[in-house]
């Protein structure tokens, strides 16, 4: 008799119909955001645009081209929390009319329109940002 009453009470107080409630410390918890996993982020996010600019600046410092390149479009962006933020970007960059010998603001540089000088590259870059140290690193930059 007591067993029947106890079972009835358990069924009445359980809103999960016998299913186990989620344990917030277990791996069974279903979530769309998992700490440490890369997450898609809007390509027009200010952090993404700043990371893309750092990628282009690294590209400009590593090439012998006489003209500066700048980003024209970010097609894909992921962000991962790892002692700061790691951005993983797919960026289209293009040659500008600004020469490296002059110190230009990239925002003021127009893209080349001369077919002989026009050049577009598609890049994958990873940019590690540590905001509290005002630090930007570009450990991965692949362009073709």
UniProtKB/Swiss-Prot annotation:
Compartments (UniProt record): Secreted
Q: Which cysteines are joined by disulfide bonds?
A: 98-109, 123-143
Chief place of localization: secreted
| Protein origin, superkingdom | Eukaryota
Q: Where is this motif: Secondary area of contact?
A: 80-84
Has keyword Lipid biosynthesis?
Answer: no
Residues annotated as coiled-coil are: none
Kindly give the Pfam families that the UniProt entry links to this protein.
Cystatin
Q: What's in the keyword line of the UniProt record?
A: Disulfide bond, Glycoprotein, Protease inhibitor, Secreted, Signal, Thiol protease inhibitor
Residues spanning the signal sequence:
1-18
Residues the record annotates as the site (Reactive site) are 36
A biological process (GO) annotation for this entry? positive regulation of myelination
SMART domains on file: CY
Residues carrying sugar: 61
Q: Name one GO molecular function term.
A: cysteine-type endopeptidase inhibitor activity
GO annotation, cellular component aspect: cytoplasm; cytoplasmic vesicle; endoplasmic reticulum; extracellular space; Golgi apparatus; late endosome; lysosome; multivesicular body
Q: Which PANTHER family match?
A: CYSTATIN-F
This molecule's function is given as: Inhibits papain and cathepsin L but with affinities lower than other cystatins. May play a role in immune regulation through inhibition of a unique target in the hematopoietic system.
- Similarity comment: family membership: Belongs to the cystatin family.
Name this protein carries in UniProt: Cystatin-F
Q: Which organism is it from?
A: Mus musculus (Mouse)
State the organism's lineage.
Eukaryota, Metazoa, Chordata, Craniata, Vertebrata
């Amino acid at each position: 008799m007591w067993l029947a009453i106890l079972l009835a009470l358990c069924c009445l107080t359980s809103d999960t119909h016998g299913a186990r409630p989620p344990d917030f410390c277990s791996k069974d918890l279903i979530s769309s955001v998992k700490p440490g996993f890369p997450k898609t982020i809007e390509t027009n996010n200010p952090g993404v645009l700043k990371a893309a600019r750092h990628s282009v600046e690294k590209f400009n410092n590593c090439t012998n081209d006489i003209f500066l390149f700048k980003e024209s479009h970010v097609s894909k962006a992921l962000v991962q929390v790892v002692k700061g933020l790691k951005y993983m970007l797919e960026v289209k960059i293009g040659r500008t009319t600004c020469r490296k010998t002059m110190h230009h603001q990239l925002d003021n540089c127009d893209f080349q329109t001369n077919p002989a000088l026009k050049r577009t590259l598609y890049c994958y870059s990873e940019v590690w940002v540590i905001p509290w140290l005002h630090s930007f690193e570009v450990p991965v930059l692949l362009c073709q």
